[in-house]
Amino acid sequence: MTETDKKQEQENHAECEDKPKPCCVCKPEKEERDTCILFNGQDSEKCKEFIEKYKECMKGYGFEVPSAN
């Protein structure tokens, strides 16, 4: 392994450590979303606002939440 390869590997590893896990971010938004879905059903229009807030929060951390449709 060359010195350049070692540097690149260290940078990649550091990036992975700096990025939080999806389960550890947006907890309040996730709780609101999950509670709404639990009591109103996944297809309820009532939950759309909470789902969108959660998706926007996750995007802020670099995660992409796929649409259920």
From Swiss-Prot:
Motif (Cx9C motif 1): 26-36
Amino-acid positions noted as binding Cu cation in the UniProt annotation, renumbered to this chain: C23, C24
Disulfide bonds: C26-C57, C36-C47
Annotated GO CC locations: cytosol; mitochondrial intermembrane space; mitochondrion
Domain of life of the native organism: Eukaryota
A Pfam family assignment: COX17
CHCH domain residues: 23-65
Record localization: Mitochondrion intermembrane space
A GO biological-process term: protein farnesylation
Keywords, sorted A to Z: Chaperone, Copper, Disulfide bond, Metal-binding, Mitochondrion
Cx9C motif 2 (motif): residue ranges: 47-57
Gene3D superfamilies: CytochromE C oxidase copper chaperone
MF GO annotations: copper chaperone activity; cuprous ion binding
Family from the record: Belongs to the COX17 family.
Role according to the record: Copper chaperone for cytochrome c oxidase (COX). Binds two copper ions and deliver them to the Cu(A) site of COX.
Entry protein name: Cytochrome c oxidase copper chaperone
